[in-house]
């Protein structure tokens, strides 16, 4: 499978400022609704609460392909979420699991460096598979 056309997982760990959890849940809900309506390449988009830390949350996202991630980053409601995130959260850290094309990694390095978003890329080894039925 061409790296540009491979599905992958993105995990974003968010730490919300004390006293801002309800506000953050509101912007997360707004972003989630917009993503569901405008991003067919986002196969799964969840915002989960840490069971041990009321200020810690995790976005779990599954993308159909590289183009879907680029569309997500460029989606105006997601960009608006990013601006509000800066006001309401202490941090965000991103991890990507799967295979991305080099040009996508270059795009992420530029886009997220400007925003100060740290990310770590876990490239797929030769072990693993994706069921074709998920992409049909």
Which residues does each PLM region occupy?
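Short S/T/G/P-rich N-terminal loop/turn motif that feeds into the first structured element of a domain
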Residues: 1-57, 64-74, 88-136
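A short, acidic, amphipathic alpha-helical segment used as a generic capping/interface helix at domain edges
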Residues: 77-83
């Amino acid at each position: 499978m061409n790296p540009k056309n491979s599905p992958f997982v993105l995990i974003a760990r968010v730490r919300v400022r004390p006293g801002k959890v309800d506000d953050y849940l509101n912007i997360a809900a707004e972003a989630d609704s917009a993503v569901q309506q405008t991003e067919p390449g986002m196969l799964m988009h969840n915002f989960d609460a840490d069971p041990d830390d009321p200020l810690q949350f995790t976005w779990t996202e599954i993308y159909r392909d590289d183009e879907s991630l680029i569309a997500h980053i460029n989606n105006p409601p997601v960009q608006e979420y990013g601006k509000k995130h800066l006001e309401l959260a202490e941090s965000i850290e991103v991890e990507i699991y799967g295979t991305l094309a080099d040009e996508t990694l270059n795009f992420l390095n530029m886009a997220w460096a400007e925003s100060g978003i740290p990310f770590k890329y876990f490239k797929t080894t030769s072990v693993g598979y994706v069921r074709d039925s998920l992409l049909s």
